[in-house]
Regions:
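Short, acidic Ser/Thr/Gly-rich low-complexity loop/linker segments typical of extracellular
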Residues: 324-346, 674-691
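Short, ordered, surface-exposed loop/turn motifs in non-cytosolic proteins
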Residues: 308-327, 348-350, 558, 657-681, ...
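Structured interaction patches on ligand/partner-binding surfaces of diverse proteins
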Residues: 359-381, 710-738
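Short Pro-Gly-centered beta-turn/loop motif in secreted/extracellular proteins
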Residues: 341-352, 357-359, 366-369, 686-712, ...
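Hydrophobic/aromatic-rich core segments of domains that either
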Residues: 35, 149-150, 154, 159-165, ...
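Short active-site neighborhood of thiol/selenol oxidoreductases, capturing the structured segment around
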Residues: 767-791, 795, 810-812
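Short, internal strand/loop/helix patches
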Residues: 824-860
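Secondary-structure boundary elements
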Residues: 36-189, 225, 262, 411, ...
Length: 895
């Protein structure tokens, strides 16, 4: 096979120039879509750059301009092409984008608000098919007729609300992995995490020609995790709404109060942004906008960076880091200007500011409500064994804003939600049960025990999984099951049969394992099409055809042959995919001959697997690796300043025999690299006692971060710098700081007089029957809302602790909060003493509100803990992650 270099051939250049002339001719047409001269000029410049960038796929992408397009269709396509990320240039073709454009312009022409939307708003927030890092699909083409019918006769405001109800019929909240499903895949599955719900809702709104954007707080300040929601542009103003969580009116949502405590809220604008909203980052093809002032009290913070001689440092990297999941997460990044200054508008809580340039670094904690500037001196000095304690305080919790709708309107909305739940539940009933799986397994001669979890996790994609298995030859059915077990749950939910078959049918061309142990290894690291967080696509047969016999023979004996080929043929561009952050497919990398580092690494693994060699991405280091028959070997495409293959060991020592800290909840470690520490990716929630006696890590400099989040959202944190020498063991004491302030009751209830109605029997239950001799945990829930689902997922993590405590636990429902789809069995693995009951007319909740002189309103879930005498010791309301940890702290005092 010819091993060409980075130079573009004369033939390719001529082809690109010809297509460029063809495309640019449209600028002289009578197009009315884009009239702003500055926008047109920038688009023309960017389009020429994109044509050269995408020259490897010029035919697939640009041949569409030879079609008989209308002037506006051409202009819309030109705008998309001018600013689209590498992932879209690599993995989609011109006809795909033409269909998107045609559907968008149809909506613009048919919807009554189409002519009311300003040009820039339309280009940034209606035309782009991509919302975030999802696999984009033909949702607009498929769903436009249904959505059009649904909103017929409505104004823009009411249409936006109605579309959110439509989305709720299709999808509800459930957590999942980091890969973002496409909108149609989420509908097929019937659920998605908040990032997927908001991607669906934004896409649905844009399908109707309504400007919409996905809005994120990258990390909360008062609790772990993040959240995404939607903003919709109505009659000249942006409003927010909860994706797939319809409220009676815009600017309502359970997240509205948490957002008032946020440190940053942001969104991305596609294209060259010249609007008036604050910009965090501006690139040629997108801008990241800072929306914090729309939600919370905020102010500018200025960071000055100096060197050891107190001279200003230009172009230093500045990260605004927030404690979350036991690490300091950069919610925003910037660079210093010629005056050594970087700034951001942020909420009024605490941040750790980290500045670095090359191997020089420094940091300081800042309390934004008390300070507006900080100077950080950077140096290359490292001091090990140093521990610093920091108290991180989030923005203060404020009195909830009053609800803007009447009780009657809220009640009617709740009835609609229950009806929509029923529609979705009816669809979910079409997913296959154990009886169907047993019959199918017998028909295929396979184990029902193995196939049951596969089909359960496939949800609405069960037909594709069944098609794949039934279409497999008898000799390969066992392999088909092994491969399905090796891919992710999300792959089972959205991968088509032909994609799975491409990997199975072409997996044995270069390798064929014998032993059962080898089979499992082979299925995971050779046969599987799942590598990292990319969309699984059919690249195996394609890649096998691209590399000739001579190359394959050389590759089998020398992995450097492939490394050299990639370095010579794949150009690295780490900026042109920033507004997508979706990895390019391996086939897309090969065709485009351009990739970011992550996609290049995935491509390396894909080629290895295609040619029968085990390979993976190491989840701890994110480096690509191949298996040499004995060990996993790193591949480093970038120059390194140290030997990354050298190892050392950490022995974690628990300083508290009564508490077993968990990774990414109570502590993390981060490894130093080029001026900054990045968290090592061990399993989330892994207990300290579960680590090996000596944990192998890359040798180098490290940072231990610990944290103890308090009930008010503040964190008692510490950082310890240490080093792991090559082949030596370093002992690290994991010390979780404690708050020894005694718990003071905030009120008292009468356990004998307080009664609930048992959900199952409808009989009255006195609270005194639940309290036993220890106390009771009371949790008021709204089962269909995301905050409650988080709490119900957190509590199983402390199940055994609550069971051993042996106090009472009751989950309390309000009659109007229970839909027909609710079942206690939907929440498995709760403590064995758990009961579900009704707090009639919210009597106890209202009494507790009176004791606290507050109104919890609809801010569910609400958690209250009493001792055996009815003294109320703990109270929490609203969205929080890790509530199980908070409960554990309180009941530990109730001996």
């Amino acid at each position: 096979m010819k091993m060409w270099g980075n130079a573009i051939s004369v033939k390719t250049v001529k082809k690109v120039l010809f297509l460029g002339i063809l495309i640019l001719a449209s600028f002289a047409t009578n197009a009315q879509l884009i009239k702003d001269s500055k926008t047109l000029a920038d688009m023309q410049i960017q389009l020429q750059k994109q044509q050269l960038l995408a020259s490897g796929r010029s035919q697939q992408l640009f041949e569409v301009f030879k079609k008989p397009l209308s002037a506006d269709e051409k202009q819309a396509l030109e705008y998309l092409y001018a600013y689209m990320p590498l992932s879209d240039l690599a993995d989609y073709d011109g006809d795909f984008f033409f269909q998107q454009t045609k559907a968008t312009l149809t909506a613009k022409n048919e919807m009554p608000w189409g002519t009311q939307i300003p040009e820039d708003i339309f280009l940034h927030f209606v035309l782009p098919p991509r919302v975030n890092n999802e696999n984009i699909d033909l949702f607009r083409v498929v769903m436009y007729p249904e959505i059009k019918t649904r909103i017929a006769g409505l104004n823009m405001h009411d249409a936006a609300l109605e579309i959110n109800h439509w989305c709720h019929e299709k999808v509800t909240y459930r957590g999942s992995d980091e890969r973002t499903s496409s909108p149609l895949a989420s509908i097929k599955t019937s659920f998605g995490r908040c990032g997927e719900e908001s991607t669906l809702t934004v896409t649905a709104l844009r399908t109707a020609g309504i400007p919409a954007r996905q809005v994120y707080t990258p990390r909360w300040a008062h609790t772990d995790d993040n959240h995404a929601w939607v903003e919709v542009w109505i009659d000249g103003k942006w409003h927010f709404l909860g994706a797939c969580e319809p409220d009676p009116e815009l600017d309502m949502g359970w997240f509205a109060e948490p957002a008032r405590r946020a440190m940053l809220v942001h969104t991305r604008a596609f294209g060259a942004y010249n609007g008036n909203e604050p910009v965090i980052e501006k690139q040629q093809c997108f801008a990241e906008l800072n929306l914090i002032q729309n939600y919370a009290a905020a102010k500018p913070v200025f960071v000055k960076v100096t060197d050891t001689d107190n001279k200003l440092v230009k172009d230093a990297n500045v990260e605004f880091q927030l404690y979350n999941y036991a690490e300091f997460y950069p919610i925003a990044k910037g660079k210093t200007d010629q005056n050594g200054i970087s700034s951001i508008i942020t909420g009024l809580g605490d941040l750790l500011i980290w500045a670095y340039q090359g191997d020089k670094w420094g940091y300081k904690k800042i309390s934004v409500d008390k300070m507006d500037s900080v100077t950080i001196n950077i140096s290359d000095k490292h001091t090990t064994g140093i521990t610093e304690n920091f108290d991180f305080v989030p923005p203060v919790q404020k009195t909830p804003l009053p609800q803007s709708t009447s009780p009657k309107v809220a009640e009617n909305n709740t009835k609609r939600l229950h009806a929509e739940d029923s529609i979705r539940t009816a669809y979910m009933a079409t997913f296959k049960d154990s009886a169907w799986v047993a019959a199918f397994s017998a028909e295929q001669g396979l184990s029902a025990e193995k196939l049951l979890p596969i089909f359960r996790n496939s949800y609405g994609n069960w037909e594709e999984i069944a098609k794949f298995i039934s279409g497999t030859s008898k000799s390969q059915k066992e392999w088909a099951v092994l491969m399905l077990e090796a891919i992710s749950e999300k792959d089972l939910r959205d991968t088509k049969a032909e994609i799975l078959n491409d990997h199975l049918a072409n997996a044995f061309n270069y390798n064929n394992p014998a032993s059962s142990q080898d089979k499992e290894f082979f299925a995971k690291y050779v046969m599987s099409g799942r590598i990292a967080n990319e969309m699984m696509l059919p690249w195996r047969s394609f890649l096998q055809k691209q590399f000739g016999y001579e190359f394959v023979m050389q590759f089998k004996t020398d992995m450097n042959v492939l490394v050299a080929w990639i370095k010579s043929n794949i150009r690295i561009d780490n900026t042109s995919n920033l507004h997508s952050r979706a990895p390019l497919s391996p086939r897309g990398v090969f065709e485009l001959k351009v990739a970011d580092n992550r996609s290049r690494d995935i491509f390396f693994v894909a080629v290895c697997r295609s040619l029968g060699h085990a390979a993976r991405i190491n989840t701890a280091t994110n480096l690509p690796q191949y298996y040499d028959g004995k060990d996993w070997k790193n591949i480093a495409f970038e120059p390194v300043t140290e030997n990354i293959t050298e190892k050392g060991f950490i022995r974690f020592v628990n300083s508290d025999i009564n508490f077993d800290p968990k990774y990414a909840i109570n502590f993390t470690i981060a490894r130093y690299n080029k001026g900054v520490y990045r968290t090592v990716d061990f399993d989330y929630g892994m207990k300290l006692s579960e680590f090996e006696a000596k944990t192998e890590v890359e040798a180098g400099k490290y940072l231990l971060v610990t944290g103890n989040r308090q009930s008010d959202g503040s964190v008692l944190s510490s950082v310890t710098f240490f080093e792991v020498p090559t082949k030596l063991t370093t002992d690290i004491n994991v010390v979780i700081r404690q708050d020894f302030t005694p718990i003071i009751p905030f009120g008292k209830i009468n356990p004998s007089a307080t009664k609930f109605i048992d959900y199952q029997t409808n009989n009255a239950i006195p609270l005194s029957n639940l309290i036993s001799t220890k106390g009771c945990i009371m949790v008021w829930i709204d089962p269909d809302k995301e905050p409650t689902k988080h709490v119900m997922a957190d509590i199983p993590a402390v199940k055994s602790l609550i069971e051993n405590w042996s106090g009472g636990m009751v989950f309390l429902l309000a009659g109007n909060k229970v839909s027909s789809s609710f079942k206690p069995s939907n929440f498995p693995n709760l403590p064995k003493q758990s009961k579900f009951a009704f707090d009639k007319d919210s009597n106890l909740l209202l009494h507790i509100d009176k004791l606290r002189k507050t109104n919890s309103g609809s801010n569910f879930p609400v958690i209250a803990i009493s001792d055996k005498n009815g003294n109320l010791l703990y109270y929490s309301e609203g969205y929080k992650i890790g509530i199980g940890e908070q409960i554990a702290k309180v009941i530990a005092t109730l001996k």
